[in-house]
Protein backbone atom coordinates (compact mmCIF):
# COMPACT_ATOMS: atom_id res chain seq x y z
CA UNK A 1 0.00 0.00 0.00
CA UNK A 2 2.77 2.46 0.92
CA UNK A 3 4.53 1.82 -2.40
CA UNK A 4 1.32 2.54 -4.33
CA UNK A 5 0.74 5.74 -2.37
CA UNK A 6 4.33 6.86 -2.95
CA UNK A 7 4.15 6.19 -6.69
CA UNK A 8 0.76 7.90 -6.97
CA UNK A 9 2.17 10.93 -5.13
CA UNK A 10 5.07 11.06 -7.60
CA UNK A 11 2.61 10.79 -10.49
CA UNK A 12 0.48 13.61 -9.05
CA UNK A 13 3.54 15.83 -8.51
CA UNK A 14 4.84 15.24 -12.05
CA UNK A 15 1.41 15.87 -13.52
CA UNK A 16 1.10 19.06 -11.45
CA UNK A 17 4.37 20.40 -12.79
CA UNK A 18 3.43 19.56 -16.38
CA UNK A 19 0.13 21.36 -15.92
CA UNK A 20 1.85 24.31 -14.26
CA UNK A 21 4.16 24.65 -17.26
CA UNK A 22 1.17 24.56 -19.63
CA UNK A 23 -0.56 27.30 -17.63
CA UNK A 24 2.60 29.46 -17.69
CA UNK A 25 2.75 29.15 -21.48
CA UNK A 26 -0.96 29.92 -21.76
CA UNK A 27 -0.66 32.99 -19.54
CA UNK A 28 2.38 34.16 -21.52
CA UNK A 29 0.61 33.64 -24.86
CA UNK A 30 -2.39 35.64 -23.64
CA UNK A 31 -0.26 38.36 -22.03
CA UNK A 32 -1.43 37.58 -18.50
CA UNK A 33 1.78 36.55 -16.71
CA UNK A 34 1.65 39.52 -14.35
CA UNK A 35 -1.99 39.09 -13.42
CA UNK A 36 -2.59 39.23 -9.68
CA UNK A 37 -5.80 37.21 -9.72
CA UNK A 38 -7.03 34.56 -12.12
CA UNK A 39 -10.53 35.80 -11.39
CA UNK A 40 -9.65 38.98 -13.31
CA UNK A 41 -7.92 36.96 -16.04
CA UNK A 42 -10.93 34.80 -16.80
CA UNK A 43 -12.87 37.86 -17.91
CA UNK A 44 -10.18 38.56 -20.55
CA UNK A 45 -10.13 35.00 -21.92
CA UNK A 46 -11.57 34.57 -25.41
CA UNK A 47 -14.44 32.04 -25.39
CA UNK A 48 -12.44 29.62 -27.55
CA UNK A 49 -9.62 29.54 -25.00
CA UNK A 50 -12.09 29.00 -22.16
CA UNK A 51 -13.39 25.93 -23.99
CA UNK A 52 -9.82 24.71 -24.56
CA UNK A 53 -9.07 25.26 -20.87
CA UNK A 54 -12.21 23.34 -19.89
CA UNK A 55 -11.07 20.42 -22.07
CA UNK A 56 -7.67 20.49 -20.30
CA UNK A 57 -9.43 20.36 -16.94
CA UNK A 58 -11.60 17.45 -18.07
CA UNK A 59 -8.52 15.60 -19.34
CA UNK A 60 -6.82 16.15 -15.97
CA UNK A 61 -9.73 14.63 -14.04
CA UNK A 62 -9.89 11.71 -16.49
CA UNK A 63 -6.17 11.00 -16.04
CA UNK A 64 -6.48 11.10 -12.25
CA UNK A 65 -9.54 8.84 -12.38
CA UNK A 66 -7.88 6.32 -14.73
CA UNK A 67 -4.69 6.00 -12.68
CA UNK A 68 -6.76 5.45 -9.52
CA UNK A 69 -8.90 2.88 -11.32
CA UNK A 70 -5.84 1.00 -12.59
CA UNK A 71 -4.02 0.96 -9.25
CA UNK A 72 -6.93 0.45 -6.85
CA UNK A 73 -8.54 -2.89 -6.12
CA UNK A 74 -11.81 -2.19 -4.32
CA UNK A 75 -14.08 0.78 -4.91
CA UNK A 76 -12.86 2.30 -1.65
CA UNK A 77 -9.22 1.95 -2.72
CA UNK A 78 -9.98 3.50 -6.10
CA UNK A 79 -11.68 6.45 -4.38
CA UNK A 80 -8.88 6.88 -1.86
CA UNK A 81 -6.24 6.71 -4.60
CA UNK A 82 -8.14 9.29 -6.67
CA UNK A 83 -8.35 11.68 -3.71
CA UNK A 84 -4.69 11.07 -2.79
CA UNK A 85 -3.40 11.71 -6.30
CA UNK A 86 -5.73 14.70 -6.75
CA UNK A 87 -4.44 16.22 -3.49
CA UNK A 88 -0.80 15.90 -4.55
CA UNK A 89 -1.61 17.23 -8.02
CA UNK A 90 -3.49 20.24 -6.63
CA UNK A 91 -0.92 21.08 -3.96
CA UNK A 92 2.08 20.79 -6.25
CA UNK A 93 0.32 22.62 -9.08
CA UNK A 94 0.38 25.75 -6.92
CA UNK A 95 3.95 25.07 -5.81
CA UNK A 96 5.02 24.64 -9.44
CA UNK A 97 3.38 27.93 -10.45
CA UNK A 98 5.06 29.67 -7.54
CA UNK A 99 8.48 28.29 -8.46
CA UNK A 100 8.04 29.15 -12.15
CA UNK A 101 6.40 32.61 -12.01
CA UNK A 102 6.04 33.46 -8.30
CA UNK A 103 2.27 33.02 -8.52
CA UNK A 104 0.23 33.11 -6.39
CA UNK A 105 1.96 35.92 -4.50
CA UNK A 106 -0.12 35.24 -1.36
CA UNK A 107 -2.33 32.49 0.04
CA UNK A 108 -5.22 34.95 -0.05
CA UNK A 109 -4.90 35.46 -3.82
CA UNK A 110 -8.20 34.67 -5.53
CA UNK A 111 -8.04 31.89 -8.11
CA UNK A 112 -10.37 30.18 -10.53
CA UNK A 113 -10.09 26.64 -9.18
CA UNK A 114 -12.08 24.96 -11.96
CA UNK A 115 -14.22 26.05 -14.87
CA UNK A 116 -16.33 22.88 -14.97
CA UNK A 117 -19.31 22.99 -14.74
CA UNK A 118 -19.13 26.69 -13.79
CA UNK A 119 -16.20 28.74 -12.48
CA UNK A 120 -15.23 27.81 -8.91
CA UNK A 121 -13.58 30.87 -7.38
CA UNK A 122 -11.80 30.95 -4.02
CA UNK A 123 -8.57 32.07 -2.36
CA UNK A 124 -5.71 29.66 -2.99
CA UNK A 125 -5.44 28.80 0.71
CA UNK A 126 -8.69 26.84 0.35
CA UNK A 127 -7.59 24.13 -2.14
CA UNK A 128 -4.15 24.00 -0.51
CA UNK A 129 -5.74 23.38 2.90
CA UNK A 130 -8.10 20.72 1.53
CA UNK A 131 -5.18 18.97 -0.20
CA UNK A 132 -2.98 18.99 2.90
CA UNK A 133 -5.86 17.71 5.03
CA UNK A 134 -6.62 14.95 2.50
CA UNK A 135 -2.98 13.84 2.44
CA UNK A 136 -2.77 13.82 6.25
CA UNK A 137 -5.99 11.84 6.72
CA UNK A 138 -5.10 9.23 4.10
CA UNK A 139 -1.56 8.92 5.50
CA UNK A 140 -2.92 8.31 9.01
CA UNK A 141 -5.50 5.79 7.74
CA UNK A 142 -2.80 3.94 5.78
CA UNK A 143 -0.41 3.87 8.74
CA UNK A 144 -3.02 2.44 11.12
CA UNK A 145 -4.05 -0.12 8.52
CA UNK A 146 -7.60 1.04 7.76
CA UNK A 147 -7.11 0.17 4.09
Regions found by a protein language model. Name each.
Residues 16-17, 85-94:
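Aromatic-anchored segments of alpha-helical transmembrane domains
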Amino acid sequence: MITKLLLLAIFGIAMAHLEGVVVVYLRKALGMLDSESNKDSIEKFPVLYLKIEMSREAATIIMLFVIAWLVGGSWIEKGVFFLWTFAFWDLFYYLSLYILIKWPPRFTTIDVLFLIPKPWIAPVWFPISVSVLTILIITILALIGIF
